[in-house]
């Protein structure tokens, strides 16, 4: 029941005023119950105190989307995904949700590709986002565009067997045996088993 949920979250916010997680959750509960202004105010309060709070950034982006403010939604999503202080795992989770949403809505993949490209310009130190991007490109039949991204995955994480195997399969298909040898030798070096 909603009344108890509100009471419980509000009491946690009062008990732990410095823990922004409860404030964001309260904003989310407000949003789920049609209290959009209260939700917005809670997200803004958290972001005023902690501008790099990924949970609040994502919730605010969701708020903009649900209230039909598409430009602000995209801007907030960019702020979250292009912020170097947001952990890679959080960005990866947000991108997964974004990709699923775009696919479910039947929207043009250029938005997804453009956002991935902008994230990768930051030279990620984690192979998760480039790997997700490569998988997305492959799912769209954009193999030519996916293979350089897979090479980027290997540059970040030489032990990434999935990326190496996809590249190896493509090299065999193209009968590029020099590339096959290079990929295999590098694979044995990084993964002797």
Q: What kind of feature is each model-predicted range?
A:
Residues 1-193:
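Alpha-solenoid helical repeat scaffolds
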């Amino acid at each position: 029941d909603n009344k108890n949920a509100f009471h419980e979250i509000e009491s946690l916010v009062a008990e732990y005023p410095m823990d922004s997680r409860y404030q964001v959750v309260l904003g989310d509960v407000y949003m789920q119950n049609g209290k959009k202004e209260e939700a917005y105010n809670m997200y803004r309060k958290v972001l005023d105190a902690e501008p790099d709070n990924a949970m609040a950034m994502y919730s605010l982006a969701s708020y903009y989307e649900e209230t039909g403010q598409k430009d602000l939604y995209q801007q907030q999503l960019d702020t979250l995904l292009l912020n170097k202080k947001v952990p890679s795992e959080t960005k990866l989770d947000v991108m997964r949700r974004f990709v699923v949403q775009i696919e479910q809505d039947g929207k043009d993949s250029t938005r997804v590709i453009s956002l991935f490209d902008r994230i990768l310009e930051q030279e990620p130190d984690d192979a998760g986002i480039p790997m997700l991007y490569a998988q997305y490109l492959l799912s769209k039949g954009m193999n030519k565009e996916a293979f350089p991204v897979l090479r980027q995955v290997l540059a970040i994480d030489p032990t990434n067997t999935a990326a190496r195997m996809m590249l190896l399969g493509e090299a065999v298909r193209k009968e590029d045996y020099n590339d096959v040898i290079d990929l295999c030798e590098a694979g044995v070096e990084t993964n002797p088993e």
